[in-house]
């Protein structure tokens, strides 16, 4: 099997995520209101999830010569039973893809992302989280379209579309795409100017007491409590940056934050699509991503990181201090 040129794959993947980001902004504008927020209505993010998955898969299929297996979150079964949601998804998809699909074609496309393993026969495969950060999406806050290309069960290309993320710290302009390609570095692209790529690097902060952590808005399990324990052990004084989704990886890769830790429960296993894209982007920006036992992330065991305990992401310079404090703060 001939393999596509990685530069072409990178270009097509960026375009796919860009289309998805623009669709997400439109879906938020049209479907999310104060009323849906107050009612905790999940339907806008459901429309977004399915629309983005269909758009990204369609762009990959149209733009690339080789069709790699795709592991994504959604399939068509649930959607087909929600006709009102399905009609909205079809409308948004056709608008942003310039297609004229009917329901059956949409279902077939969505199910292209239903490669429920075994991927051992495939050297390369995609993993996609259409909207990572459901709560952020519904609040019109931070969320990400997360796409990664895997090779031999390791991420070699990551794209994070962050439609609501400021283009720089303190900027009022929002909308970024982050891309990392193995051995080629990481870059940020503004949604307002897709022709210009800006190289990004992790911070050079080496003083543990000055480290800036990033964590989720909402604590799950003992996550925030443990993070505070570890940061206190390091002598950190700054408040953590609270942000939803894999945008946390982008913050570390761009140098806005120095560390991102995630451990909610000792027995909880992370989904591969929640980390693959951010992982390679941080590494190519000069950072490091392991688990709490300092083990490499193992993407070979299905949909979850079955062999790993949590996530430790840093600018690399702070890694020794982080793990010294981790050892003092939790027993495995």
UniProtKB/Swiss-Prot annotation:
Annotated positions binding adenosine 3',5'-bisphosphate: 134, 245, 248, 262, 274
Residues at the active site: 49 (proton acceptor), 134 (proton acceptor)
Domain of life: Eukaryota
This enzyme's EC code(s): 3.1.3.7, 3.1.3.57
Keyword Nucleotide-binding: yes
PROSITE patterns on file: IMP_1 (PS00629), IMP_2 (PS00630)
SUPFAM superfamilies recorded: Carbohydrate phosphatase
Amino-acid positions noted as binding Mg(2+) 3 in the UniProt annotation, renumbered to this chain: 73
Keywords: Hydrolase, Magnesium, Metal-binding, Multifunctional enzyme, Nucleotide-binding
Binding residues annotated for Mg(2+) 1, in chain numbering: 73, 129, 131
GO biological process: phosphatidylinositol phosphate biosynthetic process; sulfate assimilation
Residues the entry annotates as binding Mg(2+) 2: 129, 132, 274
Pfam families: Inositol_P (PF00459)
Gene Ontology molecular-function annotations: 3'(2'),5'-bisphosphate nucleotidase activity; inositol-1,4-bisphosphate 1-phosphatase activity; metal ion binding; nucleotide binding
Cofactor: Mg(2+)
Catalysed reaction, written as an equation: 3'-phosphoadenylyl sulfate + H2O = adenosine 5'-phosphosulfate + phosphate; adenosine 3',5'-bisphosphate + H2O = AMP + phosphate; adenosine 2',5'-bisphosphate + H2O = AMP + phosphate; 1D-myo-inositol 1,4-bisphosphate + H2O = 1D-myo-inositol 4-phosphate + phosphate
Similarity comment: family membership: Belongs to the inositol monophosphatase superfamily.
Functional summary from the UniProt entry: Phosphatase that converts adenosine 3'-phosphate 5'-phosphosulfate (PAPS) to adenosine 5'-phosphosulfate (APS) and 3'(2')-phosphoadenosine 5'-phosphate (PAP) to AMP. Is also able to hydrolyze inositol 1,4-bisphosphate and inositol 1,3,4-trisphosphate.
Protein name (database record): 3'(2'),5'-bisphosphate nucleotidase
Species in which this protein is naturally found: Dictyostelium discoideum
Organism ancestry: Eukaryota, Amoebozoa, Evosea, Eumycetozoa, Dictyostelia
């Amino acid at each position: 099997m001939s393999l596509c040129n990685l530069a072409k794959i990178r270009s097509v993947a960026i375009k796919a995520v860009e289309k998805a980001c623009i669709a997400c902004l439109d879906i938020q504008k049209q479907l999310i209101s104060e009323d849906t927020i107050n009612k905790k209505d999940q339907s806008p993010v459901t429309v977004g999830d399915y629309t983005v998955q269909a758009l990204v898969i369609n762009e990959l299929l149209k733009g690339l010569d080789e069709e790699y297996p795709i592991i994504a979150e959604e399939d068509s079964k649930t959607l087909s039973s929600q006709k009102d949601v399905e009609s909205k998804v079809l409308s948004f998809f056709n608008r942003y893809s310039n297609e004229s699909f009917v329901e059956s074609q949409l279902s077939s496309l969505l199910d292209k992302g239903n490669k429920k393993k075994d991927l051992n026969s495939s050297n390369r495969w995609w993993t996609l989280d259409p909207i990572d950060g459901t709560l952020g999406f519904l609040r019109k806050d931070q969320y990400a379209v997360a796409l990664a290309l895997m090779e031999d069960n390791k991420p070699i290309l990551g794209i994070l579309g962050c439609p609501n993320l400021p283009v720089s710290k303190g900027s009022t302009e929002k909308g970024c795409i982050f891309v990392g390609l193995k051995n080629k570095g990481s870059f940020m692209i503004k949604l307002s100017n897709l022709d210009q790529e800006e190289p990004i690097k992790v911070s050079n902060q080496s003083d543990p007491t000055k480290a800036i952590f990033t964590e989720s808005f909402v604590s799950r399990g003992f996550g925030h409590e443990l993070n505070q324990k570890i940061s206190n052990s390091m002598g950190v004084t700054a408040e953590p940056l609270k942000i939803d989704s894999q945008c946390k990886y982008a913050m570390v890769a761009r140098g806005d934050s120095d560390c991102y830790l995630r451990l909610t429960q000792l027995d909880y296993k992370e989904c591969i699509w929640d980390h693959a894209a951010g992982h390679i982007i941080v590494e190519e920006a000069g950072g490091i991503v392991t688990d709490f036992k300092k083990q490499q992330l193992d993407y070979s065991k299905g949909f979850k990181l079955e062999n790993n305990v949590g996530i430790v992401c840093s600018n690399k310079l702070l890694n020794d201090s982080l793990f010294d404090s981790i050892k003092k703060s939790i027993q495995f």
